UniProtKB/Swiss-Prot annotation:
InterPro entries: DNA_glyclase/AP_lyase_DNA-bd, DNA_glyclase_Znf_dom_DNA_BS, Formamido-pyr_DNA_Glyclase, FPG_cat, MutM-like_N-ter, Ribosomal_uS13-like_H2TH, Znf_DNA_glyclase/AP_lyase, Znf_FPG/IleRS
Catalytic activity: Hydrolysis of DNA containing ring-opened 7-methylguanine residues, releasing 2,6-diamino-4-hydroxy-5-(N-methyl)formamidopyrimidine; 2'-deoxyribonucleotide-(2'-deoxyribose 5'-phosphate)-2'-deoxyribonucleotide-DNA = a 3'-end 2'-deoxyribonucleotide-(2,3-dehydro-2,3-deoxyribose 5'-phosphate)-DNA + a 5'-end 5'-phospho-2'-deoxyribonucleoside-DNA + H(+)
UniProt-listed GO biological process terms: base-excision repair
Protein name: Formamidopyrimidine-DNA glycosylase
Cofactor(s) named in the record: Zn(2+)
Length: 296
């Protein structure tokens, strides 16, 4: 699943190419892609026509385009506090360029300068919906995103406040890093990378870690995601691409994730993989020893 860096790469690409442009045509090729828009495909299509894209936003793994009524009458401009929310799911792609002729095209839109915007999604977990914007903690976000915490790359991210929350959690630190209501955007890959950099096993209880160590983990999470962003994100297959259809290459720089059986880049011990929450965790048994189980 695309994590924060991959979604931010897509947001930046869209921001540079679609902001200020009006939507002139929309076609939903598969109803599942708009299942989260409760009023249905016809409503979404009708409301999008003529709307102008005024900007882009992101919170964690959620992406949206802010909209207004463009050149429509004032009555239509009441939609100015609306956003087109895009969830990429496991394999969603927002592509600019000729509309692709392929089986996984779910939605296609045309803009007033002739630009085509396509939503391609092989596994169909992603989709589009229109949602009202609400102000949460001084920031306008779509209603479906209102519950999502700020992410470590957000300028208003309060690291100390998150550390305080983590100190009160009687559960594994990795589980908390993946909880989007605590801190958003840190998915499985970047959680493993941050924990490796901090020399902390993901099975450690959050409450057992000191405030400085928790702050260090969050700082590493921010750093590794900035590093990934600089390399276009992480692509293990062709499913994650930017708006031009290009893959990221941060997978070549990963220190933990996907490196089972390989030597730790820091100490040389053989990296291990364990099952965790229907996922896999990768860690160094020497640098990141598992917590001891207390016997009764």
């Amino acid at each position: 699943m695309p994590e924060l860096p991959e979604v931010e790469v897509v947001r930046r690409g869209l921001d540079a190419h679609v902001t200020g442009k009006a939507i002139t045509a929309v076609r939903v090729h598969h109803p599942r892609a708009v299942r989260r828009h409760e009023a249905g495909p016809a409503d979404l299509t009708a409301r999008l026509l003529g709307m102008r894209i005024t900007g882009t936003g992101r919170r964690g793994k959620y992406l949206w385009l802010t909209l207004d009524g463009g050149d429509e009458p004032l009555a239509r401009r009441a939609e100015s506090s609306v956003a087109l929310v895009v969830h990429l799911g496991m394999s969603g792609q927002m592509l600019l360029g000729p509309i692709p002729k392929e089986d996984h095209l779910r939605i296609a839109a045309l803009l007033d300068d002739g630009t085509a915007l396509s939503f391609v999604d092989q596994r169909t977990f992603g989709g589009w919906l229109l949602a009202d914007l609400v102000t949460v903690d001084g920031t306008d976000v779509p209603v479906p995103v209102a519950h999502v915490a700020r992410d470590p790359l957000d300028p208003r991210f309060d690291r100390d406040a998150v550390v305080k929350v983590l100190r009160g959690k009687h559960s594994e630190i990795k589980r908390q890093l993946l909880d989007q209501t605590v801190v958003s955007g840190i998915g499985n890959i970047y959680a493993d990378e941050a924990l490796w950099r901090a020399k902390v096993n993901g099975a450690r209880l959050a409450e057992s870690l000191t405030k400085p160590k928790l702050a260090e983990i969050l700082d590493h999470a921010a750093d590794v995601m900035r590093d990934a962003l600089g390399q276009g994100g992480t692509s293990f297959d062709s499913l994650y691409v930017n708006v031009n259809g290009e893959s990221g290459y941060f997978d070549r720089s990963l220190d933990a994730y996907g490196r089972e059986g390989e030597p730790c880049r820091r100490c040389g011990a053989i990296m291990r993989r364990e099952k965790f929450m229907n996922r896999s965790s990768f860690y160094c048994p020497r640098c990141q020893p598992r917590p001891r189980v207390r016997r009764a």
